């Protein structure tokens, strides 16, 4: 008999990968705002950000992948939406599990390296202070704290995975924007594009969950290579049979950013954004390698196969 698993966020980028990877080994029930579209037999239609349920099925494993990201809030209302989805969605899920007498053995929470609140640094580990101050980061920090207490009080094994930029087929966010820009010929590199960034392959995250959840704890997951912008640009351009993007000299980029400072929020780039783009930011996944033999793929080796 397959182990039962409750999955939130199955329609999202990472959630889809988790569903496809684990469905052969687990009896999966999904939770989502829309009807079941995932090819499995069981689905609970509900909006976790706004409602609770007393009818969740008893499952040994809960994987909470639903969340809100990739949007810079333009108003207090949009900022509040991060808390509704990331924090209160988590609270409502846990309260629904309790009301349904469906406390799991394992709880897996998909979090983010944004909780550290750093824009540059090398091999930042899990001991770093949680200084994230954006609505996205704060809502994830508060959800982590809530789950730590909730799971601890109920003897539930909690696994928190803090993820950087996630790569895979048709990725969202900045990586997706880079792919679209290079494909259309409208992408411009900046300077030497030597800044390195941590990334991780979605399929690797999905595949390691069954092993990692038995260890429990808090872990960064990365591909361990941390490619430079130039390596990502070259990989994407080669796979798409496009020219390697032209580069703007750093001096000109700084001038453009200076104009952006004057334009305010309307500007696509300013000095702060330029600094983030051109600064190395990597995270240490050594704890995961030691705890459950995390052996990820290099994203630049995998990315060309899905473009």
State the predicted function of each range:
Residues 211-269, 305-307:
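Mid/C-terminal beta-alpha module of Rossmann-like enzyme folds, strongest
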Residues 37, 48-88, 92:
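NAD(P)H-binding glycine-rich loop region in Rossmannoid oxidoreductase-like domains
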Residues 285-290, 294-307:
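Amphipathic terminal alpha-helices
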Residues 133-159:
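Active-site Tyr-X1-5-Lys
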Residues 116-117, 159-177:
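Flexible, glycine-rich beta-alpha linker
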Residues 171-177, 191-213, 220:
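Substrate-positioning beta->alpha
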């Amino acid at each position: 008999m397959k182990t039962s698993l409750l999955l939130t966020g199955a329609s999202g980028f990472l959630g889809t990968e988790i569903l496809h990877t684990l469905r052969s080994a687990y009896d999966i029930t999904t939770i989502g705002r829309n009807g079941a579209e995932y090819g499995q037999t069981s689905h609970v239609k509900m909006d976790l950000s706004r409602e609770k349920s007393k009818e969740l099925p008893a499952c040994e494993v809960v994987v909470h992948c639903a969340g809100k990201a990739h949007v810079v809030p333009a108003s207090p209302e949009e900022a509040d939406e991060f808390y509704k989805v990331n924090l209160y969605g988590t609270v409502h899920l846990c309260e629904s599990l309790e009301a349904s007498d469906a406390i799991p053995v394992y709880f897996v929470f998909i979090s983010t390296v944004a909780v550290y609140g750093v824009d540059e640094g090398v091999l930042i580990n899990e001991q770093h202070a949680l200084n994230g101050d954006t609505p996205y980061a704060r809502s994830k920090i508060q959800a982590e704290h809530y789950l730590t207490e909730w799971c601890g009080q109920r003897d539930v094994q909690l696994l928190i995975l803090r993820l950087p930029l996630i790569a895979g087929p048709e990725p969202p966010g900045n990586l997706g924007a880079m792919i679209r820009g290079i494909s259309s010929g409208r992408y411009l590199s900046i300077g030497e594009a030597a800044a390195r960034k941590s990334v991780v392959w979605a399929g690797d995250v999905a595949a390691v969950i069954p092993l990692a959840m038995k260890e429990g704890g808090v872990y960064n997951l990365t591909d361990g290579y941390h490619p430079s912008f130039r390596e990502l640009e070259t990989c994407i351009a080669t796979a798409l049979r496009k020219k390697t993007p032209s580069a703007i000299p750093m001096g000109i980029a700084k001038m453009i950013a200076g104009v952006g400072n004057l334009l305010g929020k309307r500007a696509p780039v300013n000095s702060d954004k330029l600094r983030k783009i051109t600064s190395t930011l990597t995270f240490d996944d050594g704890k995961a390698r030691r705890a459950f033999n995390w052996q990820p793929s290099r994203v630049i080796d995998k990315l060309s196969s899905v473009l």
